[in-house]
């Protein structure tokens, strides 16, 4: 009868041990995968920050409407990364850390299992010793009575530890179910909050891009192609708008040293012509 009870308790202990091992395995895997998920999200935030910087740099080189639209888009996208940072921090605190805590919890349950197994092994050892004593010395009541007393103590201790283990594992199972529900609920809530904010931000960012006036920026670009010719064209317009006298004065005053020499040559030629005319008149009179 006692041997059968021992076998039943051993089977029960094995089942409890398997339950703890199962949680240790799968919670450990979940912890690693969720931690990798959080790291990937953090890296996505870092890449998005680089994208924001590049968009701002590009915007500074563009036409007014496109420049403003790109900057507004970058501002919205940067705001989204603030929400993503909050997402990372919440996932770390509400999902990864509780799963990580199960490493310590499982270790404590294994210690309880170890204590129970030790007590049951002691009980089984005392039972075997009693059976051997009865076989070897069936008439030695003192030795048999002493062995029975030791077995009784071992049985009481094993029963106590077994009951404690059952209660502990029962609470462990109850807490495990509650925790995994809370962890996954927190995960879903955090993701929904982020994606809800992301939808708002992306809607605003999309509108900023759609508000860019393509025609106006194209006109600005086309006008910029002729900016280098603007001074010469202005000079032509100004020249065409002057009177003949103004053009003559402008030509004489702005022609430089070579033009001054030409004016002086013409004046000298005029003086020489006048002298020749006076000489001709004098000769006729003579």
From Swiss-Prot:
It is found in: Cytoplasm; Cytoplasm, Cytoskeleton, Microtubule organizing center, Centrosome, Centriole; Cytoplasm, Cytoskeleton, Cilium basal body; Cell projection, Cilium. Disruption phenotype: Knockout homozygous mice show uni- or bilateral abnormal bone growth or exostosis on the deltoid tuberosity of the humerus, abnormalities at the left stifle consistent with a tendon calcification, and abnormal digit morphology including polysyndactyly and osteomas on the hind paw metatarsals. Exhibit male fertility defects, caused by kinked sperm flagella with the annulus mispositioned in the principal piece of the sperm. Its main location: cytoplasm. One of its GO terms (biological process) is inner mitochondrial membrane organization. It comes from the Eukaryota. Residues 271-286 have a biased composition (Acidic residues). Expressed in the heart, liver, spleen, lung, kidney, brain and muscle (at protein level). Strongly expressed throughout the developing limb bud, including the progress zone and the apical ectodermal ridge. One of its GO terms (cellular component) is ciliary basal body. Pfam families: FAM92. Keywords: Cell projection, Cilium, Cilium biogenesis/degradation, Coiled coil, Cytoplasm, Cytoskeleton, Differentiation, Flagellum, Membrane, Mitochondrion, Mitochondrion inner membrane, Nucleus, Spermatogenesis, Transit peptide. Residues 1-47 form a transit peptide. It is a peripheral membrane protein. Signal peptide: none annotated. Residues 258-286 are annotated as: Disordered. Residues 107-178 form a coiled coil. Residues 10-220 are annotated as: BAR-like. The BAR-like domain displays limited similarity to other BAR domains. Plays a critical role in regulating mitochondrial ultrastructure and function by maintaining the integrity of mitochondrial morphology, particularly the organization of cristae. Preferentially binds to negatively charged phospholipids like cardiolipin and phosphatidylinositol 4,5-bisphosphate enhancing its interaction with mitochondrial membranes. Induces membrane curvature and tubulation, which are critical for maintaining mitochondrial ultrastructure and the organization of cristae. Plays a crucial role in ciliogenesis. May play a role in limb development through its role in ciliogenesis. Belongs to the CIBAR family. Homodimer (via BAR-like domain). Heterodimer with FAM92B (via BAR-like domains). Interacts (via BAR-like domain) with CBY1; this interaction is required for targeting FAM92A to centriole and cilium basal body. Interacts (via BAR-like domain) with CBY3; both proteins form a ninefold symmetric structure at the flagellar base; are recruited to the annulus in a mutually dependent manner and regulate annulus positionning. This is CBY1-interacting BAR domain-containing protein 1.
């Amino acid at each position: 009868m006692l041997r059968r009870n021992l076998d039943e308790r051993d089977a029960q202990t094995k089942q409890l041990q398997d339950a703890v091992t199962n949680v240790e395995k799968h919670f450990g895997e979940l912890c690693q995968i969720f931690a990798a998920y959080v790291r990937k999200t953090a890296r996505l935030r870092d890449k998005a920050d680089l994208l924001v910087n590049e968009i701002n740099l590009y915007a500074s080189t563009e036409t007014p409407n496109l420049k403003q639209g790109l900057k507004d888009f970058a501002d919205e996208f940067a705001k989204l990364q603030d929400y993503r940072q909050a997402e990372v921090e919440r996932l770390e605190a509400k999902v990864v850390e509780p799963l990580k805590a199960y490493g310590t919890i499982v270790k404590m349950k294994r210690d309880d299992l170890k204590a129970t197994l030790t007590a049951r092994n002691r009980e089984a050892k005392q039972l075997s010793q009693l059976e051997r004593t009865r076989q070897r010395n069936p008439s030695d009541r003192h030795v048999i009575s002493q062995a029975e007393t030791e077995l009784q103590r071992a049985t009481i201790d094993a029963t106590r530890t077994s009951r404690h283990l059952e209660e502990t594992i029962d609470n462990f199972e109850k807490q495990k179910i509650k925790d995994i529900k809370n962890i996954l609920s927190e995960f879903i809530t955090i993701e929904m909050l982020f994606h809800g904010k992301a939808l708002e931000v992306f809607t605003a960012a999309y509108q900023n891009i759609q508000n860019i006036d393509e025609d106006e920026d194209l006109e600005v670009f086309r006008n910029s192609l002729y900016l280098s010719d603007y001074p010469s064209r202005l000079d032509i317009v100004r020249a065409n708008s002057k009177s003949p006298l103004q053009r003559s004065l402008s030509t004489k005053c702005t022609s430089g040293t070579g033009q001054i020499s030409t004016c002086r040559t013409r004046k000298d030629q005029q003086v020489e012509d006048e002298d020749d005319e006076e000489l001709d008149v004098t000769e006729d009179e003579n």
